[in-house]
């Protein structure tokens, strides 16, 4: 993607969706952290189905601890890797209660010290909950960054660094949502919907797919 195409690329995405947000359902920072932790290798739809049952019963660190490991597993067993996720969430809740007064920390260092929370999860929480200009590179953003030529890279971290450098500051806080949604619904993995893509003119992907 040419440098002069980056601004209109994001301006177009913004015009179509001025106030983007995550599709994970949450009402507090802790609920967001929990949902993101559960979302690894799972769909937002699947996570939402589980948390709609979990959160009315337990939506604080202490309430999760009170469920016990087996109790928590019963609520999230429809999600992939639920046993390890349950263990990580229980350990995270114990740290939040013991070290952070049950409050989700606002620093990357403290977030990444929580079990099951890596760089991507920390970036999501920092961006969505606290409005920090971070870029959580998931499979959708990795694909869009490479396919469009916006931020080609061999690793998620490399794509993240290029995106942080290339995205105009005024778009950075919301760029994470625009790129995820674009990858999820338009620039799809198996067959991108180029014929209905609003930013196709700015994209470096050559074999544009035609309308069926």
Model-identified regions with their sequence ranges:
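Catalytic cores of DNA base-excision repair glycosylases
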Residues: 2-212
């Amino acid at each position: 993607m040419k440098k002069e195409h980056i601004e209109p690329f994001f301006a177009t995405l913004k015009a179509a969706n001025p106030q983007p947000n995550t599709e994970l359902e949450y009402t507090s920072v802790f609920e967001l952290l929990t949902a993101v932790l559960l979302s690894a290798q799972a769909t937002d739809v699947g996570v939402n189905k589980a948390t709609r049952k979990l959160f009315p019963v337990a939506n604080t660190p202490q309430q999760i601890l009170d469920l016990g490991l087996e109790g928590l597993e019963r609520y999230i067993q429809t999600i992939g890797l639920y046993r390890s996720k349950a263990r990580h969430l229980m350990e995270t809740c114990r740290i939040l209660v013991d070290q952070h007064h049950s409050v989700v920390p606002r620093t990357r260092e403290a977030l990444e010290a929580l079990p099951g929370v890596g760089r991507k999860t920390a970036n999501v929480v920092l961006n969505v909950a606290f409005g920090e200009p971070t870029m959580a590179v998931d499979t959708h953003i990795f694909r869009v960054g490479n396919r469009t030529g916006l931020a080609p890279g061999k690793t998620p971290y490399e794509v993240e660094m290029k995106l942080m450098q290339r995205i105009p500051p005024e778009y950075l806080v919301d760029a994470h949502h625009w790129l995820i949604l674009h990858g999820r619904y338009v620039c799809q993995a198996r067959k991108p919907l180029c014929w209905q893509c609003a930013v196709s003119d700015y994209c470096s992907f050559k074999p544009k797919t035609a309308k069926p």
